[in-house]
Amino acid sequence: MVAVLNLVCGSFNLHSQTPNFGANVLIFDSSMSMASIQSQLNTVFSQQQNNQFGTQRYALFFKPGQYSNLAINMGYYMQVLGLGQSPDNVKINGSLDCHAFLPNGNATCNFWVSSENLAVSSTNGYTMWAVSQGTSFRRMHVQNNLYLCEWSGSQNWASGGFLADSKIDGSVNPIGQQQWLSRNNSYVGWSGGNWNFVFLGDSSPPPQTWPGPYPSYTVITNMPLIREKPFLYIDSNTNFFVMVPNLRTNSVGTSWAGGPTPGVSVPVSQFYIAQPGVDNAGTINAALNSGLNLILTPGIYHLTNSILVTNPDTIVLGLGFPTLIPTNRNPAMVISDVDGVKVSGIIFDAGTTASPSLLEVGTATNAVDHSADPICLYDLCSRVGGQFIGTTTNCVTINANNVVGDNLWLWRADHGNSGTVGWTINPSQSGLVVNGNNVTIYGLFNEHHEQYQTLWNGNWGRVYFYQSELPYDAPTQSAWSHNSVNGYASYKVASGVTSHQAYGLGVYGVFNTSNVKCFNTIETPTSSQQVNVHDMINVLITAQTGSEMTHIINGTGATLGSAVTTATANNLWLNPTFALSAGLDGSGTNFAITLPTESWHSYRLQYKNAVTDPSWSNLGGLVGGNDTLETITDPTSASSRFYRIVAY
């Protein structure tokens, strides 16, 4: 009784409406002096602007109201949050910008910044959000134009990015952005961009243009399934709550277009508020076991044991990029195989001794169905090396079924503090291993690991937008090969998988230390009838002489051997070519394939009588486009006939 009471009192001041979020959460009110607010913003930014591998983290809260003539500049590990029930409850008049941290407009290292749940009206007519991986822009109302990259400079590059549940009153201009995922947004127009842009459930997206010429757009009409990220807000009595939005299916546009986002409000008194330097796995697990949810305040948490999330519907909310570091060969966090857990806003940083995984979701593969209340992961980053020497086997392992990921960056560092990066210094095998079924990820960024970046063993997996760089630093081809195959595919769907769908995949090569080759950047089963891969691109950015990206998928796609070159593939096939055995066809029965279709594609069966025929012939008309199982038949099939299924 005393222990539980101490936990509750430690996490929430019962005599105050404002919880104790710690020294690194700054809470602003519109009644405060704007000059005082600006001074505090400037102090934080000046510290964080060049603090890529520092230990300081900040969350900046704005209570409902109007804030005039503020210039909010974003630096590393800074999160800006509005505390209204709607983004329009907090309005910033002035600017909220993230400019390129490197010289000459180079934003390719603009990591770990976030802005959520407020409106901004910029005095210069646009909001600049020049960012790369590990960033988020959610529940925002930009009352001007939105730029996703610096528009001036000799190297105006950026490697983003993620925009969700937001309204842009003007247009979105990516400028020099390499790739982006836009989901459940509205805007007047979208123009420009480069290699791989995916639009998912936007209310007025640009037309499909894949494979370009640039920009290359993949457009999917409806968002299949999402529960928007939980968010903090205060009511009219300044009491703090966390809103847990309702689950949406086949959605288009923002969750707040018709008013406050529907959902369930949870008082912050039902959360344990952890503090860096005070709390550890023991105190946090005691709170979770007592039935409390968890808020992690900004800072670094060293964990000799795993944080164990065992209760259904637990909310774990990270503020200001809290960073979990396992120190005893343990995962930083293990989520039990229970319904409805929601984890957001955390960096999982590998310790100096290898963990099996930094985040483990579900402890073993099983048949437990979470489809009515899925486990959800939002805005999560993993990092191996960079700040200090780190190592892990995998970054994230998903064993549970029906998990939804929304904006994940799994990074083996390619640069960092001196002595923290190298093939044998910060090793990790894979960024993501999926063993569960019906796992869906929107926005998967996965880079530089030493074997498969992504290894997918479960069935009915779905990925919408994939960005991956192969490892920069493989010392030799023999060090980066397996079974006499050069390199490892970035995106590997295991041979036993019978159903998988992926849309908008970009894999990039930066081979700047040795002349190595990667035979396939994407590998999928070639005998399955329900494996879909749509809109793929390889880009060889930098290459030592003799390096190459040999193929895109399964031995097909142009070979790239010099920088900067690209190769694309835009057909969706359930398998590139498959043949029926004579025994199956010999009876003269109809050949039939049953496949799951989706509302944004139509499908057609094509055939060749010999694999060497120069072209494919159509069989019948288009089917599908209705989110149901469809059967496609060939009533005249012959024993030598080869088939493929193409999507439009």
Residue ranges of each PLM-predicted region?
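N-terminal extracellular ligand-recognition/capping segment immediately after the signal peptide
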Residues: 30-79, 85-88, 95-97, 276-282, ...
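Long amphipathic alpha-helical scaffold regions
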Residues: 305-338, 342, 460-501
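Low-complexity, Pro/Thr/Ser/Gly/Ala-rich linker/spacer regions in secreted
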Residues: 12-19, 572-587
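Right-handed parallel beta-helix
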Residues: 67-79, 84-206, 342, 347-440, ...
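Short, composition-biased motifs enriched in small/polar/acidic residues
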Residues: 577-648
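Bacterial N-terminal signal peptides
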Residues: 1-10
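Right-handed parallel beta-helix/beta-solenoid
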Residues: 16-39, 249-280
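Gly/Ser/Thr/Ala-enriched C-terminal appendages of enzymes
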Residues: 176, 192-238, 351, 466, ...
